[in-house]
Amino acid sequence: MYDNPQGLIAGSVIMWVVTTLCVGMRFSQKLRDRQRFFASDWLIVAAWIFGTGLTILEIYGVAIKSLGYKIGAAILDPTAITGQLNKAKHIQLAFLLLGIAGIDLVKLSVCFLYWQLFAKAHTKLRRFLIVWITLIALWGTSFVLAGLLECGSHLTAVFGTPTEYLKHCGSAVPSGYAMVATDFAADFVTLIIPIPVVLGLHIDTRKKILTLLIFLIGALSVASSITKGYIYIRSSMGMYTEDALIILTGISMWNLAEVQIGIIAACGPLLRPVLIRAFSPLTTLIASKWRSSSQVARHPKENQELPSHSDMPGSEVDLAKQSTLSEAKAGAQ
């Protein structure tokens, strides 16, 4: 799967094009609606820059035959220590550092989006987000430092013999396990943050389902972090048997995929006009089953109509206002 240079380049370019389109549409939508740019927007641009860097690295690695090709030896085999493998290790270290930073920027962008949408109306959520944003920032910083210092003061041991690597870099694999586990946990928590808020909105059921589905696009990011974790764990267990370059290629490719998929997922809530048209038939079906009781009998015509674009919370401002109104009504009751 990973010894296909043309496929790796094509996949990298396609993901970059899709993320570029998503970020471009996000900004053009804001300019068209004359909305302000917030921290969440600039953070996603920073993540896109890191994603672009990872794409260039992937293509460069394939071009110099350090990624996407077989070397014929396992990563801990003394015969595998060649210039080709060392170049791949340099690329892999850059992938690790840029990948963690890019993923962290995506998470922070999503958290700041929640802040601008919901924090004003929800005091408890505001307090939680302050803590959560701090933890996410510390998560990224700590694992970037862990990547830089995985061999302590013997950084060159990463590119040395297996004996040197095992002697000086013993914490690298446990640190990697901790990173992929906490990455998944952070993605999952970030994904479910808006669910109680959206369920509490005083809007039509179909609108509520549609809004929820748009936020749950973030499940793509959770799925990619699970996949990357699986690839990392499987690769670390196969260091004695699997081809060295294939292991590094697989890890680098899923590092890139997680960042790019995260950017796409983070742009989802701000591309509601496009996604509304895509999800409307599905939400109509779900809502009709959800409310197939007395409400259907009393309002048959209402349930037969698809939600129009003007009826939906189609912008950040509308959704923030809807959240504020719902919280005010709940407080009044």
Task: Give each language-model segment a name.
Residues 1-320:
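Extracytosolic/lumenal membrane-interface segments
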Residues 314-333:
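Fungal low-complexity intrinsically disordered segments enriched in serine/threonine and acidic residues
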